[in-house]
Amino acid sequence: MSKKSFILLNGNISVLIFSVLRDEFSVNYSVDKILNRVLVPRDMQEIRQWVESRYIMSYRNDIRVFFDILGVSRIEDFIEITNCVSLKDTYWVKGLNSKKHWDTVSPYRNPLNKVIADYSFNRRINGKNITGSPDFSTDGNFPKCWKRMNGEIYLLKAGSSGAINSGNEPYSEVYACKIARRLGIGVVDYTISDYKGVTVSKCKCMTNEKFGLISYRDLYRVYECDFERLLNSSKSDVDKKFLIDMLLLDYVTCNVDRHYGNIGIIVENSTNRVLGYSLLYDHNLSCIPYYMKDEDLEFYISDICAKDGRSFKDLFKLIDCTYVRHKLQKLVGYNVSIGCKRDRVVRDMVKIQLRNALKY
């Protein structure tokens, strides 16, 4: 049996020591010593699960093929080379006797690895020099990568491909952003860009070395969507208002993909203290990206549903109140536009949702 020991850190603060134990039949993990219980990652249920979450990547099914091509065959090798860095927080891992420190591995301070970014975006391998990269720990089903531009870090995310109605998802991010701003709802700013000849949505990284991000799912370990239960679990009026705003935006934009994994919560990295909900993000499946012009729009909207299975009419009933109706008045006469051929369809969608809600 072989044993390799590592230390998990938050910035330059040691949090715990763990080991990877390997024999000819299996690979096991053990937590050997907790050094700072307060700073144990909030999304850590067990050490194996946490380490594996640091290399989920967009194309998770191909991740082992990627490692094999680059000569990284064991999890111990992956940890040593990449240090399990992420843009979600300031946690990282090094060998127990390693001299590395946070300044040398931080994705906020160091160049982002182009080889890994290219693979995360288009599954192509251009070179073999890999280091720590936040692309490893960025989940989701669409091609995406992190890029540093003019001193800022941005997430670039492409749409689907291969079908007549594919590729509209990046535009949905921008439409939803504009509608949210019209409603006075806090949202990450998205724009349309081009990367390697592909249309992508572009947004600035919302985290930094002071503030990290954890999903509602990972913080509370709740996996099945139930928006009524979510509203009833609100711990304050501020939280409830946030959730109502979120569901209102989802109603207006017909967002079919609001799940607990894309409801973000801000954490103070240095203390592990939960601060509150983040800006809203990840709306690429809102604004009916797969609708085609020969379909009946009203029927199409009535036939799709929110992530917890309820119709959008029922979603509105869940949040219907004077506050919501006052917000919706801001959309009366509003013609959202991003200069795209889908402008008319999205405007008509908003009008239908307004009419269904306000009965005019």
Locate the predicted segments by residue:
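Phosphate/dinucleotide-binding and metal-coordinating scaffold of catalytic cores
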Residues: 1-248, 252-254, 266-360
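Conserved protein-kinase catalytic-loop segment immediately C-terminal to the catalytic Asp
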Residues: 259, 264-266
